[in-house]
Amino acid sequence: DTIVTPEFPTAFQSVSIRLDSNTIDLNHYIIQWSVDEFEEKSGMGARDFSIAAGAYGSRKRIVATINGNGVTVKKNIILAPQDATVLWEAIDSYVPPFYRGKKLPGNESLIKISALPNFRVDNDSLKLDNAVYLWTRNDNRILNIGGYAKDSIIIEHNKLRAAEKITVDVSDVNNSTRAQKTVVIPIINPQIHWYYKNDNNYRKLSSIDRGLRVTSGNVLLVSEPYFFSTKDYASDLNYSWKVNKETLYLEPGSSKKELLVQNPG
């Protein structure tokens, strides 16, 4: 057996190769290592070999030749580092229209994960629809989802987990070029951030989560929910306002996320 660590090296990464056998004792055989037909190492029982991978899209052909007792065995290893990018976003996570960041998932959110292979072979790039994708979730292979041109998946967060670990194996149709990428998606609690509108009914985009000092006049507070899993923001979210632990009832037709606070002074 030939053990390559890591199995999917990145560009210029150090790679360790080890030969193992259950039938012969390799410690009593001369093992010669060559890279692209140039000998790099040779010795009795030289089962281990280290090498640095090349740039993305490059290929190194490593041959381990085992000699002894009138027997010659060759093992071929190809190092062809490739890269892939994994992108993710919560589909049903609510954020305000002015929010420019990523939609983060909360409990039981729907999450879309997409893979982008950055393969280069002979100066040609691998097309998204000409690759094979195998998906793993929390170290368990996802069945009936991956395959040819299946470059994205949608999962629902398991509420018993604090994060979702997703791994994708990407290869060309001949399985001669491969890459593996893992991403850990954190699950966060929904949040509420506070804003206010000025006298011209203009909302300040900076939050006032640390408090707001009002010296005169009234202030219109705005509560903005973030990262709630909801299909219909308008109907799925309920608001309950309290001041000093006393429930307030808003006037019919008024915005349920705004509260006019009058300054008695």
Residue spans for each PLM region:
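A short beta-strand segment in extracellular, disulfide-stabilized domains
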Residues: 11-22, 104, 108-119, 123-124, ...
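Exposed beta-strand face motif in extracellular beta-rich ectodomains
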Residues: 58-62, 162-166, 219, 265
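Solenoidal tandem-repeat scaffolds enriched in leucines and small polar residues
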Residues: 102-171
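Short, compositionally biased P/S/T/A/G/V-rich stretches that sit at domain boundaries
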Residues: 1-9, 76-105, 183-214
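Surface-exposed, flexible coil segments in extracellular/virion-facing regions
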Residues: 34-51, 136-155, 243-261
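Conserved structural position at the C-terminal beta-strand
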Residues: 64-68, 170-172
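Solvent-exposed loop segments of extracellular immunoglobulin-like
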Residues: 25-32, 124-134, 232-240
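Short, surface-exposed loop/turn segments at beta-strand-coil junctions that are enriched for proline
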Residues: 52-57, 156-160, 260-265
